[in-house]
Amino acid sequence: MNYNANVVKFHSTILHKFALKISKFLILCMRRNKRQLACMKCQCENPMAAITYADIEYPHNTHFLLLDSISWIPCTCKILKLKEFELPDRFDIPNLFYDGWLSYVFHTFSGVYLKIGYEMDESGFCLPDQVYHLIDNHSCIQTAVSHLLRNHQALFKYLCDYLRSGEFPLTVLIHHVMLYQYYPKSLQEALWAAVEHYVNNSGEAYSTVQKLAVQKKIGNIRMYLVNPRDIFALGSTCNCIVVSSSNFQSYVQLRKPLLENNLPYEIDGFDKILQCANSEADIGWIAMIHCIGSNGYAFPIHLYLNMKKNIFLGKLPESTLLLYNSDGAIFKNPPSSKKECDFYNQLLLDLCKCRQFNAEMECNMKKLFNNPTGLHSLPNLPNFSEAGSAKSSNFCSSKDNCLTNRLTLNCLDTPSDENGEDIAIQLIIPAE
C-alpha cells in the first residue's frame, strides 16, 4: 500500500509540475502577443504596434485662434520695443476639417502617445482609432542604431552628403526626419542642414524669424515641415495647439504652456531673432515650436504632407508612427537578418532617389543654359556639388541564408567613385 501510494504521489507531483509549466508558458505567450515586444532582452513595447489604452476623447473645437491672438504677445512686443504690427481683420477662424486624418498627440507620466484614425470621406473609407506609444530614448534602441550605423558607415555618409547639399526629394527628407531622435549627432546635424534648405527653398512663405530659427536649431525639427499658416492656438487652453486643414487635423499637447516666460531667451542670439519679427504671429510661432518639445516627435508629419502635396501618389504610408515598416529594425536588439536587410534596401532606394533627383535637376539646368531666354526666370541658381564617394557595399553583412538573390543597379541611381565611374550597388532581396 505504501509503495502504491508513493507511486501515485510521485506521478501527481510530476503532472502538477508539468501543468504549472504549461500554464506559465501560455500566460507568457498571451502577454507577448498582447504587448508585441520589440526587444526580447528588456521586453520593451514595440512602438510600431498599436496598444490598448484607456479611452481618451479627441478635443472638439468649432473655432481656432490665429497665433497673433495669444494674449501676452502685445505686451512682450512693447517690452522688446518691436515695431507695431498690422493686425488681421479677425483672430478666430472656423474649424474647416471635414474628413481625413484626425489625431491627438498627448503625454502622461509614462511617455508620449499618438491617437489617430481616419474619418469617413465621401467614398465611405475610414480607419478605426489606434493608439501608439512613442519610445523616445531606450538603451536597446541606441544599441540597435549603433549596430546599423557601424556595419554600413559609407552608406550613411553618402546620405549625409546628399542632405547637406540639398539634393534630395521630399520623401527622403520626411523618412529620415521621422527617425531624427534615434540618430547620432552627426546625422542630426545633416538633417538640420536639409530642413534649413527646405525652409529657404520650399516656397511655403516662411518668414525671416522662421528661417533664423532653423539656423539656430530651435525647437522640434518635424514642426518646421508644417506650413506655419496651418498652425492655430486654442482659446480654451495654452497647453495645446492644432494643425488643421480640410482633410487633416491634429491636436498636439505642448510640453510647456504657451506663455511668455517659456520663450527661450537663454539661446544665444534669440533677442536678435525676435527683432526680425514681421508680425505677432512670428512671436506665437517661435513660442510654439519651442514649447512643443519632444511631443513633436509623435506628430504624423508624413500624413500631413501627403494630404497637402500627395507625395505618395494616392497611396497610404506603410506605417503610422514612422514612414516605412522596415524602420522597425531600430527597435530590435539585435535586429533580425530580414529586418536589417529591409532597412538597408530602403536606405539604398533613398540614395537612388537622391541620385535621380540630382540628375533631373542638372538636366533642367542644362536646358536653361542652352536656352538663354529662360535664364532670367531663375533668380538664384543652386550650386550643385558632387556628392561624396561611396564604396560598393552589401547591405547585410551577416553570413546567413537571408541573402539569396542580388540585383545589381547600373543606372543613373548608382553612386560614382573618385574617377566618376558608376559603382554597382547590390540590392539585397532576402529569402521568403
Swiss-Prot record:
Q: List the disulfide bonds.
A: none
Q: Which InterPro entries match?
A: Meiotic_expression
Name the family the entry cites.
Belongs to the UPF0300 family.
Q: Which GO terms describe its cellular component?
A: cell cortex
Q: Does the keyword Cytoplasm apply?
A: yes
Protein name from the UniProt record:
Meiotically up-regulated gene 134 protein
So what does this one do?
Has a role in meiosis.
Annotated localization = Cytoplasm, Cell cortex
Major place of residence:
cytoplasm
Establish whether keyword Cytoplasm is in the entry. yes
Please indicate which superkingdom the organism of origin belongs to.
Eukaryota
What are the protein's UniProt keywords?
Cytoplasm, Meiosis
Q: Name one GO biological process term.
A: meiotic cell cycle
